[in-house]
Regions:
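Short, small-residue-biased leader/transition segments that mark boundaries at the very start
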Residues: 1-5
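Class I S-adenosyl-L-methionine-dependent methyltransferase module
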Residues: 6-102, 106-116, 126-130, 137-144
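Short acidic, S/G/P-rich loop/turn micro-motifs used as interaction or catalytic elements
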Residues: 126-131, 159-161, 217
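Conserved beta-strand signature within the Rossmann-like core of class I S-adenosyl-L-methionine
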Residues: 148-157
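Short beta-alpha junction loops
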Residues: 156-162, 189-192
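Rossmann-like AdoMet/SAM-dependent catalytic core
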Residues: 167-262
């Protein structure tokens, strides 16, 4: 199951945000063998050669193409789901897809008990602590699926250190209460971020990846890629701002945040 972006493919226009993001990444990653050999780099560089950036659902379909029985996509916006269906039809080979035009939190929670333990959930919202009309959040989806033994990968973002601290507390307390102590959580944050003011907006100033029930190899790769991204962005600029990053890891055993300037 996957929450989705509005579109499958984004047309690139060399905006400052895109220059700081995908263009900078592809240029710098080309010099690093691990990043250059990553599937993300290979798929995006191929698509970017035609001036297009692959969105989250498109990547999911291409990355998991040969390894799964089907995709389930949830979105409140019908247009987003129609875009997914169109993209799927244009692929030479793709597993069956099913779309659900409903609230993705309640929609996924409803079908979770009927899904196999081998299910992989990619949860890609913006606000993971925002309650829906029934009082449920995206983190509730992750904890419920994790307790059923399913693999989960959740993305979250923040614009200030205050927001980050609120989310860190929310995540660690929610997981602890659910009895989930084994997880991987890695954040990449612009050094330009401030405590309670937004000084610039390249799209997001800090983002985190929270993974549960993944293999030790996958958990290790999240940390490896995090360190690699910090390294290649060490001299980056976004407009007149410092574009360098630091990596913060939320410990999976003690629920203690460790700030690491790598």
């Amino acid at each position: 199951a996957s929450d989705v972006y509005k579109r499958q493919i984004y047309t690139m226009a060399h905006t400052p945000e895109q220059e700081y993001g995908i263009y900078y990444f592809l240029n710098e990653a080309n010099e690093d063998v691990i990043l250059r050999n990553s599937l993300y780099y290979q798929l995006e560089s191929e698509s970017m050669a035609n001036g297009n950036y692959l969105g989250s659902p498109a990547l999911a379909m291409k990355v998991l193409n040969n390894d799964i029985k089907g995709h389930l996509f949830f979105d409140l916006e019908k247009g987003a789901l129609e875009n997914i269906e169109t993209f799927a039809r244009r692929q030479a080979v793709t597993p069956p897809i099913k779309t659900f035009n409903c609230d993705s939190v309640d929609g996924v929670l409803k079908i979770l008990p009927s899904l196999p333990k081998s299910t992989f959930l990619h949860i890609d919202p913006y606000e993971i602590d925002k309650r829906n009309n029934n009082g449920h959040t995206y983190l509730d989806v992750l904890t419920s699926a994790t307790k059923l033994g399913m693999k989960c990968l959740l993305w979250y973002g923040f614009m200030t250190i205050n927001e980050k601290q609120v989310l860190n507390k929310y995540v660690s307390e929610k997981l602890s209460k659910a009895g989930i102590n084994d997880y991987a959580c890695s954040e990449l944050i612009m050094n330009a971020i401030k405590k309670d003011t937004v000084v610039c907006n390249p799209g997001i100033l800090g983002s985190g990846i929270l993974a549960t029930n993944l293999s030790p190899k996958s958990d290790a790769m999240i940390q490896t890629y995090s360190k690699k991204l910090v390294a290649i962005y060490k001299d980056a600029r976004y407009k007149e701002f410092d574009g360098s990053l630091y990596n913060d890891i939320i410990s999976k055993k003690q629920n203690i945040r460790i700030k690491r300037h790598l």
